[in-house]
């Protein structure tokens, strides 16, 4: 299947169209835009683009000339497991992040919609299942691992790592030890397929910016609510709040 036209257009799946207002950009300039590289990995594909768009002022002024702006970014495509994790429906009595999807099997969902709790998939090793069910702490097959931006100041790294792993006691109450870990961003020699753009990796990025903010969205499997990855952004001025 030839998808060249789909990749070259500045549409919602691979383009910047839905971010125009946030980025302050307007008209797409295709002749100055290109697909930079395609990076395949196990069950995933990362595509990097360079797009050129004209700038747009939030307060239009005819005397101000629109200038071209160039943006480089990545898009990650991942192959989901054939059999999804068993989803857990929302319970309005407890606050959770959720993901609502329309389900067309009305024999199961009368309202045509289902809303799953967003949660990580933690599963004990088969040989430890009996111990897990007996109340012993066991390590999950696939722990939650957050990689920390190599650009983060050296003095700040141990505090970010400690903040991530401070959640371990909560997972221990669910029967898992060492369920959530923080590690430094690997070098190419350590992991040749690692990419910040790859949705298979949870990542904490460091932003050198006067903006006093932080964010932490996650990508989930719509079939079950399984959290596939999370990308946390920390701005260096957040300490000024």
Where are these regions (language model features)?
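Zn2+-dependent metallopeptidase catalytic core
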Residues: 151-179
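Auxiliary tRNA-acceptor-end handling modules of aminoacyl-tRNA synthetases
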Residues: 1-152, 170-174, 185-241
């Amino acid at each position: 299947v030839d998808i060249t036209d789909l990749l070259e257009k500045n549409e919602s799946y691979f383009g910047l169209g839905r971010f125009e207002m946030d980025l302050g950009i307007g008209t797409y300039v295709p002749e100055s835009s290109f697909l930079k590289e395609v990076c395949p990995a196990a069950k995933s594909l990362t595509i990097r683009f360079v797009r050129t768009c004209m700038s747009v002022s939030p307060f239009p002024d005819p005397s101000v000339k629109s200038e071209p702006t160039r943006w480089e970014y990545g898009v990650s495509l991942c192959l989901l497991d054939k059999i999804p994790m068993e989803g857990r429906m929302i319970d309005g009595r407890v606050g959770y992040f959720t993901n609502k999807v329309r389900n067309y099997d009305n024999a199961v969902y009368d309202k045509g919609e289902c809303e799953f709790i967003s949660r990580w998939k933690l599963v004990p090793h088969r040989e430890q299942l009996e111990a897990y069910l007996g109340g012993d702490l066991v390590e999950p097959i696939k722990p939650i691992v957050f990689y920390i931006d190599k650009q983060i100041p050296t003095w700040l790294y141990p505090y970010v790592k400690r903040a991530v792993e401070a959640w371990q006691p909560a997972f221990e109450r669910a029967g898992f030890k060492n369920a959530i870990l923080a590690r430094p961003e690997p070098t190419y020699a350590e992991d040749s397929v690692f990419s910040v753009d790859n949705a298979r990796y949870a990542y904490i990025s460091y932003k050198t910016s006067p903006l006093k903010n932080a964010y932490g969205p996650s990508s989930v499997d719509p079939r079950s609510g399984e959290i596939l990855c999370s990308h946390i952004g920390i701005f260096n001025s957040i300490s000024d709040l």
